[in-house]
Amino acid sequence: MTDMKTADSLSVPNRRVIIGSIAASIAFVMELTLVPLLLPGIQEQFALSIGQLAWVFNSYGISVAIGVLLGGLLGDVYKATRVFAAGVICFATGAAIVAFAGSYELMIFGRVLQGFGGGVFSPLIPLLLTRSSPHRPGKVLIIWGSVAGYVAAFAPFFYGNTLAENGWTYAFVIIGIVSLVALAIVWSARLDDRPPSFDRSLSSYAELLKSGRLWVMLIYVFCTYGSITYFLFRLPLWLADNGFQVASIGFTLSVMWLSFSVVSTFLRNLVDEPHVRMILMSAPLLIAAGFPIAYVYPEYAGLIVSSILVGSGLACSNAPSTQLILKFAPRGMGAASASLDITCARLGGVVTVALLAQSVLAYSFVLVVGLSFVAFTCALVAAKKFD
C-alpha cells in the first residue's frame, strides 16, 4: 500500500514540470495542425508562388530535424530544463517574428528559428515527464499523448470558427504565448535536474549504437509512424479526388485524432510494463486493418471505421514505444534516445510518403501491410521480457 501511494503521489515541483511540459507540447502540436489552415492567408498577403509557400511550410520541418538532434545531445550533457528553456525561447521568438513579419524573407527566418527551437525542446518533453513521474512513466506519457491528440483534433476547428476572420497572425501569437506560459510553469518548479555524471565520450555514443533492443524499437517507430503519416497524407487527396467536400475530409481526420486521444486515455492505466507487449503488437494490426477498409468500403461509414482503427493504432504505438526507447537507452543517453525517436518517426513519414505518393492505392496498401508486419515482429522481439 505504501509503495502504491508513493507511486501515485507527486511533489509540487514535479507536477509543475509535467503541466509545463504538456503545455509546451500543446504549443508544438498547435503549430503542426494550424499552419496548413493558415497557408492560403499567408499566400494571399505576401503574393507567394506555390514554391515559395512550400518553403514557408518546409523550412520549419527542416529546422525541427536539426534542432531535435542538438536538443537530444545537449539534454544529456546539461540541465534538461535549461536546454528546454532555450528551445522554447527560440520557438516563441520565431513565432513572434512570423506573426509580425513584413516580408517573405523575414517570415522564412522566423519559421527557421521557430522550427529550430521546437526541435530543441520537443525531445526533452518525454525526458522531463518520465523523470518527474519515475514510478508510472507509461501513465504520464499516455496522458501527454492523449492531450496532444485532443489539441490536434480541435485546434483547427476552433480557430477556423472563431479567429480565422481576423487573419492568420493571431495563431502565431497564441502559439508563442502558450509556449512562454509553459516555460514559466516549468521554470517555477526550480527542479534540480542536473544530469547524472556518466561518461559521455565517443565510447558512450558507441554504446548507443550497440543497443540492439533500442534500435529494434526505433525500427518499430519508423514503420508505424511511416504508415500513419502516409495515411494522413494520402487520405485527404483520395477523398478530394472522389468528390468529398472539405468539411467531410476534415471531420474524417478529426475522427482519427479523437480516436487516438480516447484510446490513449483508456490505456493510461494499462501502459506500464505488464501490458506493454500486447499494446505494442496491437498497433501494427490496427494500422494494417484500417488501410484496406478505406479502400474496400469507400462509403463514409467505411472511412470513419478506417480512421478509428488508424487513430487507435497510433495510440497503441505512441507512449509504449517512447517508454521502451527511454528504458533501453544506455545510461545518460535518455535525451539522445528521445531525439532519435522523433527523428525516426519523421524519417519514416518522409520515406513512406516519398515512395508511395504516386503509387496505386492497392500497391501502397501492400507496402503498409509489410511495414506493419515488420513493426509487429519488432514488438515481439523488443518487449519479450514483459510476458
Language-model region placement:
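Cytoplasmic helix-loop-helix junction between adjacent transmembrane helices
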Residues: 110-148
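Paired small-residue
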Residues: 94, 105-114, 301-309
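Helix-breaking motifs and short loop linkers at transmembrane-helix boundaries and internal kinks
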Residues: 47, 79, 100-106, 117, ...
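A late C-terminal transmembrane helix in Major Facilitator Superfamily
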Residues: 328-361
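Helix-to-loop junctions at the C-terminal end of transmembrane segments
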Residues: 68-79, 262-275
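Extracytoplasmic
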Residues: 16-50, 71, 231-236
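Helix-loop-helix hairpin linking two adjacent transmembrane segments in secondary transporters
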Residues: 135-138, 142-187
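Conserved MFS/SLC helix-loop-helix module at the cytosolic interface between two early adjacent transmembrane helices
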Residues: 65-102
